[in-house]
């Protein structure tokens, strides 16, 4: 069902953050940092995949996503909704249902047998495709999916995520340089504000998280494992 009312962006961000905290998708651990895919430490971790197990929250967030896309991209901006393997697939299906559009998904790499395709489902030349994922940190992983979509002759100028880290300034520029606009529901800053308001974490933890969010590179550099060759 296509939404007919448009809540303010700030309210969408606040409620999204609240839901993520409610289902304990947000983890803060400054004393024992998580390791990102890049190998760098982080005091924060978010598990958006948990959302598929909470129908009421899942449904509300997909309404928010549809509203965000209709308002910011347009009512007739897309012909096809593509999910990125694997976390983006369920959310792409839900967004496609909301907008009444076909759904496809993009593999990270070809299967290696059969059609050896990266696109599953029907995607045709000239279609305007929206790439849907659960989250993005620096935007890098989205570009491979976008390239696979464009190789079919379709266009992809937009990607939508539930959660955007919002702390690496190069992210938006990297996507824009590739001709892609990012749409998102909330960021770490929204989660931090809601965590403070709800008292979900203690003040010391939140202060350390804010230090990371304000200057992630410096925070990470100070906590990188020592290079053993430096002492030789």
Curated annotation (Swiss-Prot):
**Domain of life of the organism encoding this protein:** Bacteria
For orotate, which residues are the binding ones?
A: 137
Which GO biological process annotations does it have?
'de novo' UMP biosynthetic process; pyrimidine nucleobase biosynthetic process
Q: Which UniProt keywords apply?
A: Glycosyltransferase, Magnesium, Pyrimidine biosynthesis, Transferase
An example Pfam family from this entry, by short name, is Pribosyltran
Quote the record's binding site residues for 5-phospho-alpha-D-ribose 1-diphosphate: 107-108, 111, 133-141
Name the needed cofactors: Mg(2+)
Catalytic function, reaction form: orotidine 5'-phosphate + diphosphate = orotate + 5-phospho-alpha-D-ribose 1-diphosphate
A single GO molecular function term of this UniProt record: orotate phosphoribosyltransferase activity
TM spans, by residue? none
According to its UniProt record, in which pathway does this protein act?
Answer: Pyrimidine metabolism; UMP biosynthesis via de novo pathway; UMP from orotate: step 1/2
EC annotation?
2.4.2.10
- What InterPro entries is this protein classified in? OPRT, PRibTrfase_dom, PRTase-like
Family stated for the protein in its record: Belongs to the purine/pyrimidine phosphoribosyltransferase family. PyrE subfamily.
The entry describes its oligomerization and partners as: Homodimer.
This chain's function reads:
Catalyzes the transfer of a ribosyl phosphate group from 5-phosphoribose 1-diphosphate to orotate, leading to the formation of orotidine monophosphate (OMP).
Q: Which NCBIfam families match?
A: PRK00455.1-3
What name has this protein been given in UniProt?
A: Orotate phosphoribosyltransferase
- What species was this sequence derived from? Cereibacter sphaeroides (strain ATCC 17023 / DSM 158 / JCM 6121 / CCUG 31486 / LMG 2827 / NBRC 12203 / NCIMB 8253 / ATH 2.4.1.) (Rhodobacter sphaeroides)
Upper lineage:
Bacteria, Pseudomonadati, Pseudomonadota, Alphaproteobacteria, Rhodobacterales
